[in-house]
From Swiss-Prot:
It is a multi-pass membrane protein. The chain crosses the membrane at residues 33-53, 77-98, 113-133, 178-198, 226-246, 288-308, 320-340, 347-367. The lineage of its organism: Eukaryota, Metazoa, Chordata, Craniata, Vertebrata. This is Cytochrome b. CDD domains: cytochrome_b_C (cd00290), Cytochrome_b_N (cd00284). Belongs to the cytochrome b family. It comes from Centurio senex. One of its GO terms (molecular function) is metal ion binding. Component of the ubiquinol-cytochrome c reductase complex (complex III or cytochrome b-c1 complex) that is part of the mitochondrial respiratory chain. The b-c1 complex mediates electron transfer from ubiquinol to cytochrome c. Contributes to the generation of a proton gradient across the mitochondrial membrane that is then used for ATP synthesis. Heme b b566 binds at residues 97, 196. PROSITE patterns: CYTB_CTER, CYTB_NTER.
Length: 379
């Protein structure tokens, strides 16, 4: 008799995705981040659901409701810090996942890659709106500064900002709609994840060599299920240590001050995972130019497949491209550091230099190096 997992209409979908899925035999730990992101999303939706049961999206009570969650709700502090630090883990896994895709040439699966970029934007939007909800100083001023960027859009900018605010400033209407969207978006992200996996399973996984692995495939279960479970345990251990020992390590102390429209914090900055983009935004003196650079810093990923000039898919056997890739990583770390610094000398010029190099490496140096490597290999 055929196994029920291969015949049942629902179980056979799960079976073909997670049990009998043919997977390359050479996948390294860099391929763990997809499943880790799935766990992060699950943790965020669960903790977020329980937080939403106690949170009130009203300017008068939002800050106090978060305090109430931490002090009076059973394990409310754990839920709150798991959710806040879970977002950091989410972005660490996201950036490593994208970095893996860039290094090993996974972007040549264009549908999977483009859905991934959509997912990145959706998760960033969700995280931004979530940061506004505790209604602390950085929540309020972060929301004001970032939404105000839309006023740089010619002709419709001002009206657009007021439409998003629901008034003439960030206020009760803004907080309520941000809560509604923050609740809704993770489920849209979950749906996009399904589409992401659907397109991935059409082509099959890439592997570290970048060479087609059709002759050498192994079943996903038990080999990669056990490997993924090890990844889950490591990530959840790191998250637990962060939550239980230093829950405020990655947060901003200003967010423990209730939002006050009459008092601007000395340094307005977003959460650490947006600092690289914030540094690129600030490095351009013109408002519209800054906004365009900000959007392009992420959207540039969409043209990476077009800029792929190498005859090889992966960077595994391309030492010159590897050097450029790690230089790009160093530049992203530099931009993250600069984003958290005040706008003064020497930080301004460092940020501008790093921003220019970021775009130059992706748009010019990487394709040029690929062509040179082709020439050196007489291809």
């Amino acid at each position: 008799m055929t196994n029920i997992r291969k015949t049942h209409p629902l179980l056979k979908i799960i079976n073909s995705s997670f049990v009998d899925l043919p997977a390359p035999s050479s996948l390294s730990s860099w391929w763990n981040f997809g499943s880790l992101l799935g766990v992060c999303l699950g943790v965020q939706i669960l903790t977020g659901l329980f937080l939403a049961m106690h949170y009130t999206s009203d300017t008068a009570t939002a800050f106090n409701s978060v305090t109430h969650i931490c002090r009076d709700v059973n394990y409310g502090w754990l839920l709150r810090y798991m959710h806040a630090n879970g977002a950091s883990m989410f972005f660490i896994c996201l950036y490593l996942h994208v970095g893996r895709g860039l290094y090993y040439g996974s972007y040549t699966y264009s549908e999977t890659w483009n859905i991934g970029i959509l997912l990145l934007f959706a998760v960033m939007a969700t995280a931004f709106m979530g940061y506004v909800l505790p209604w602390g100083q950085m929540s309020f001023w972060g929301a004001t500064v970032i939404t105000n960027l839309l006023s740089a859009i010619p002709y419709i900018g001002t009206e657009l900002v007021q439409w998003i605010w629901g008034g003439f400033s960030v206020d009760k209407a803004t907080l309520t709609r941000f809560f509604a969207f923050h609740f809704l978006l993770p489920f849209i992200v979950a749906a996009l994840v399904m589409v992401h996996l659907l397109f991935l399973h059409e082509t099959g996984s890439n592997n570290p060599t970048g060479i087609p692995s059709d002759p050498d495939m192994i079943p996903f279960h038990p080999y990669y299920t056990i490997k993924d479970i090890l990844g889950f345990l490591i990530m959840l251990t790191v998250l637990s240590v962060l939550v239980l020992f230093s829950p405020d390590l990655l947060g901003d102390p200003d967010n423990y001050i209730p939002a006050n429209p009459l008092n601007t914090p000395p340094h307005i900055k977003p959460e650490w995972y947006f600092l690289f983009a914030y540094a690129i935004l600030r490095s351009i003196p013109n408002k519209l130019g800054g906004v365009l650079a900000l959007v392009m810093s992420i959207l540039i990923l969409a043209i990476v497949p077009i800029l792929h000039m190498s005859k090889q898919r992966s960077m595994m056997f391309r030492p010159l491209s590897q050097c450029l890739f790690w230089l790009l990583v160093a530049i992203l770390f530099t931009l993250t550091w600069i984003g958290g610094q005040p706008v003064e000398h020497p930080y301004i010029i460092i940020g501008q230099t790093a921003s220019v190099l970021y775009f130059l490496i992706i748009l010019i140096f990487m394709p040029a190096t690929s062509l040179m490597e082709n020439y050196l290999l007489k291809w």
